[in-house]
Amino acid sequence: MARSTGLAHPVGAAAPDPARVLGPDAVGRRVRDTLEDVFAAVAATRADTAALLTAAGGTGRAPFSADLAALRPGLHGRLAAQDLVSGAGFVAAPGLLADVPAWLEWWQRGPDGTVRPLLLDLDPAHSAYSDYTHWDWYALPRETGQRAVAGPYVDYLCSDEYSLTLSAPVHVGGRFVGVAAADVYLRHFEAAVLPVLLELPVPARLVNARGRVAASTDPGHLAGSLTKGPDFAAVLAAPPGVHRHGDLHLTPCAGTPLVLVTPER
């Protein structure tokens, strides 16, 4: 697994400027603001997909993979408009489509800025990628009915980059039909949130529902590592407020599915 490119509080570093010190709630809101535009893009893909599949169902037939081509103009526009987003699309639940067992209608932005499709062999007879249902970016929205942040992980499926995936479930008529999602390169996410974390007077890390560290200024807890002990999914599902686990303060990031973890001072 690739290592984080993130910064950490260096040993012996000067204390943060008191005039710039933020509290955990303020940092959580800043992190939320960083990711809300990405989640807005995911929500738009979810709405487009639900409308498309509802219309297909109204014709009395099951949808085909070719029907999902109607999502492409919106996906291309979101990739062009969102600097943080490196890839976006819809991942169909197995068995949803009449002509293929699995499908990703997925587009990504290349290094030169061009938008291109992800072409995968999803034939279960000879593809290691045919069952994507166990990956957190798919499983968490399916299990919880809520949006999720998965990773960071090396995205062998799409880019071979260390990435986060933000996703949300898509339902049609009360039935789960797949997830809408967007990828964010970890290096871009860290560039956006590490300056905010560094405004805290203590080392801190952002942790997802599975306990995976998404960004950190704590040299003892690097991005990609697991924080064991707290039930972060329960923290995210609880009413807003600061939670405690031993000497750790756990602050949900204002509606975004990440928890800010800081030590007790």
Predicted regions, residues:
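Extracellular/periplasmic juxtamembrane segments that couple receptor/chemosensory ectodomains to their
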Residues: H221, K228-R265
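Short, glycine-anchored, charge-dense loop/turn motifs used at functional sites
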Residues: G95-L96, G173, A204-A214, P219
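Conserved beta-strands of PAS-like sensory domains
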Residues: S159-V193, L260-R265
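Short amphipathic alpha-helical segments
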Residues: G28, F39, A43, F64-L79, ...
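Juxtamembrane extracytoplasmic/periplasmic/luminal helical "stalk" adjacent to the first N-terminal
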Residues: A2-A66, E161-S163
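Short, basic/aromatic recognition patches
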Residues: T133-C158, L186-L197
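Solvent-exposed, extracytoplasmic
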Residues: V184-A214
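Extracellular/periplasmic ligand-sensing ectodomains of membrane signal-transduction proteins
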Residues: L84-T144, A215-G220
